[in-house]
Swiss-Prot record:
Belongs to the sirtuin family. Class III subfamily. It is found in: Cytoplasm. The active site is at H121. Its EC number is 2.3.1.286. Signal peptide: none annotated. The gene is cobB. This is NAD-dependent protein deacylase. 2 residues (Tyr-53 and Arg-56) present in a large hydrophobic pocket are probably involved in substrate specificity. They are important for desuccinylation activity, but dispensable for deacetylation activity.
Length: 255
């Protein structure tokens, strides 16, 4: 089964109005990341940490998925509908599996209609119990400290991967990329490459087997991303690259 792997970063949600970690303004400029996103001292800063993530959930609840989120949600239909028609004419075309891996902790992909998103760095609308690992959804509400309903532990944590904390979904990500082949495509959107070195990951994957096509869409050139890894690059806001990306994907998967 051919695969399209969509790997996204903060630039995807920036056009919805969410401040990114490296923006000069917004919440991140008002708080020290090493105080509100540090696994080694988050318990010492318990109230501050939850105050910060309460504000982030409040911010998230005020924005909507943008056109790129909605386009990504529609990709299974866009790419598979012509292939179904070809199959009916006995020109066999396997359905395309679309896999979403994101560094974002927001739920805008899900709200746009994407299911089974792999969130590498956690999910803002959820809380986790560090003791029993019970996870529960609190939406966009403010978290009021209380004991875990599952094991009664008293220090519940935002379901966010902090600095110096293990990120278990990275194993899944590396496994997905390592299995790609010449019939597969990777679409990278809105990432600087500073946290997850996506170009190195792709280069390593291709040391085993060539990936069919690789597309990059960023607002501008990022030194941490090797342009040579990609077959097509669009430097423009994500919502302005939709038509061109759709054309590239259709040419690869359908033509």
């Amino acid at each position: 089964m051919p695969k399209l792997v969509v790997f996204s970063g903060a630039g995807l949600s920036a056009e919805s109005g969410l401040e990114t970690f490296r923006d000069n303004g917004g919440l991140w400029a008002q708080y020290d990341p090493m105080e509100v996103c540090n696994y080694e001292n988050w318990l010492d800063n318990f109230e501050l940490v939850h105050r910060f993530y309460n504000l982030r959930r409040e911010e998230l609840g005020k924005v909507q998925p943008n056109a790129m989120h909605k386009f990504l949600a529609s990709l299974p239909m866009i790419l598979n509908k012509p292939r179904i028609a070809l199959s009916a004419k006995k020109k066999h075309k396997d359905p395309i599996e679309v896999i979403h891996i994101t560094q974002n902790v927001d739920d805008l992909l899900e709200r746009a209609g994407v299911s089974n998103v792999i969130h590498l760095h956690g999910e803002l609308c959820k809380i986790i119990c560090p003791q029993c690992e019970h996870i529960f959804d609190i939406g966009y509400t403010h978290f009021e400290p209380h004991n875990c309903p599952n094991c009664d532990y008293g220090k519940l944590k935002p379901f966010i991967v902090f600095f110096y904390e293990r990120a278990p979904k990275y194993v899944i990500m590396h496994d997905i990329f390592s299995q790609l082949s010449s019939k597969d495509c990777v679409l990278v959107i809105g990432t600087s490459g500073n946290v997850v070195d996506i170009s190195t990951i792709l280069a390593f994957a291709e040391s085993r087997a060539r990936i069919g096509y690789k597309i990059l869409n960023n607002l501008q050139y990022c030194p941490s991303i090797a342009e040579s890894v990609f077959d097509k690059i669009f430097y423009k806001p994500t919502t302005q690259a939709i038509a061109e990306i759709e054309q590239e994907l259709e040419q690869f998967f359908i033509s």
